[in-house]
A protein has these predicted regions:
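Extended alpha-helical targeting/anchoring segments
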Residues: 1-451
Length: 451
């Protein structure tokens, strides 16, 4: 049983940014950041780079590179990922204060779902980033904000890894700037037409809820890491992440957990229901109360809770699925969200990768029933979602997993920045309110980058 060697570094609250900045241009350098959030899930930042192996999925094929050979396979990507984890000689016991003990970390894009469900191909695939981009890492730097402790863990010599980290010199990147205004992929009129098409599907009994999104696009120059740091400081989202790949970067400021697995215990926290924050504290408190008591938002949230209970129930110990929290209002810098919590116990014979597959992509960003909602999304949204509404996270050698839903997430590719926003449409949704909600969710991000 091989466990990692661990050394403790002197405390500094910005350790993740300090050590990541010189690595930020390296392909496969990745940072999971708790966004300095005033939030119970803000505890850990996790930094990795220089993986032992990588897996890149595009469409039907996955490239598995173990550093010596590259194998191209048409097998299930999450099965290939599990095989890579099983191949490593590391079997650490879970550790309360170190959530990630090496293992797989990276991006699972929304369109990876096409490998698990049969979906049509109407939407244009215009961004050539991978559907899955995951590294297998044998070291990590973990910043624990609650205990104010920085741990460098490695299955090799952590002192050597520390020397490597400290020898990295930042290359001053070009200053980040947008070079065009944000443009949506649909006009107000087109959004209205798509909204009414969703309503027709809802009223004919095809589905109960569909998440409809618009995508904003702008051209830019400069260093994406600079943009992420600027956004991260202001948005303070507990599931933030920066991922550097060969062909682009992902900047995620997500408030939403998808699935956490800790020592066999499953937790998922779908967000459904949103209202903008208000400047006046009494009015803001009233706004939170309004969201908590909104029949429409509660109905939307309950549909997704039922969907997630069903998804998780496929791999959970029978009878273990519970809903300890229903309709809790959580404040974030720009919006209030309505959040519920579902828990369960993973069946003893299954892995984290089986749980991820069973629930992917998250129901909170598709609608219900999930597959029919995904078919309608593919028909009505002009382009594929790519990284947006997928997941970023880790599957640790110890069996633990934690993943986000990649909402409030930007994709940087070939000098273009893409940022999408959507909302769950139900039978009593109002078109103007749903359209406005897409702006409430990302205005803060879009405007920050314009300045």
């Amino acid at each position: 049983m091989l466990s990692p060697a661990i050394i403790t570094l002197p405390w500094r609250p910005d350790a993740a940014e300090h050590y990541f900045a010189p690595l930020s241009a390296l392909p496969w350098a990745m940072l999971l950041h708790s966004g300095f959030a005033d939030h119970p899930h803000n505890r850990f930042d996790i930094l990795v780079a220089a993986p032992r192996a990588t897996l890149l999925t595009r469409g039907e094929q996955t490239w598995v590179d173990d550093g010596e050979t590259v194998v191209v396979s048409a097998e299930d990507p999450l099965q290939l990922l599990q095989q890579q984890l099983d191949r490593q000689p590391f079997t650490p016991q879970p550790h309360d204060d170190l959530p990630f003990l090496g293992g797989a970390l990276g991006l699972f894009g929304y369109d990876l779902g096409r490998r698990f469900e049969r979906l049509p191909s109407h939407a244009q695939a215009d961004i050539a980033l991978a559907d899955m981009a995951v590294g297998i890492y044998d070291w990590a730097l973990i910043v624990d904000h609650q205990r104010q402790q920085i741990s460098l863990l490695s299955y090799d010599d952590p002192q050597q890894r520390l020397q490597w980290l400290e020898a990295q010199t930042p290359t001053p990147g070009e200053t980040f700037a947008l070079t065009s205004a944000w443009q949506s992929n649909m006009s107000r009129q087109q959004y209205g037409e798509k909204f009414r098409q969703v309503q027709a599907y809802l009223h004919s009994g095809d589905c109960y809820q569909v998440n409809l999104a618009q995508r904003f696009q702008a051209s830019y120059v400069g260093d994406e890491w600079q943009a992420f740091r600027q956004l991260n400081t202001v948005n303070r989202a507990p599931f933030s992440a920066f991922i550097r790949l060969d062909e682009g970067a992902i900047l995620s400021l997500s408030p939403e957990r998808f699935i956490q697995l800790r020592q066999g215990e499953i937790q998922t926290r779908p967000i459904k229901g949103t209202l903008p924050r208000l400047d006046s504290p009494p009015e803001d408190a009233q706004q939170a109360e309004k969201l908590a008591n909104s029949p429409k938002d509660r109905a939307e949230n309950l549909m997704i809770v039922d969907l997630m209970r069903n998804d998780i129930g496929r791999v959970a110990v029978p009878g273990s699925v519970r809903v300890p929290e229903l309709f809790v209002v959580e404040p974030f810098p720009a919006v209030h969200h309505l959040v519920s919590t579902i828990t369960a116990r993973l069946s003893m014979t299954l892995h984290a990768s089986d749980l991820l597959r069973a629930a992917f992509p998250g129901g909170s960003i598709t609608g219900a029933p999930k597959v029919r909602a995904m078919e309608i999304i593919d028909e009505l949204e002009p382009q594929r979602r790519n990284a947006w509404c997928g997941s970023i996270g880790y599957l640790s050698y110890c069996g633990n997993m934690d993943t986000s839903i990649t909402i409030r997430t930007l994709t940087a590719w070939q000098g273009q920045l893409y940022c999408s926003a959507g909302g769950g449409i139900v039978a009593d949704s109002e078109e103007a309110a749903e359209y406005q909600e897409t702006f409430d969710k990302v205005n803060r991000i879009l405007q920050q980058l314009e300045n």
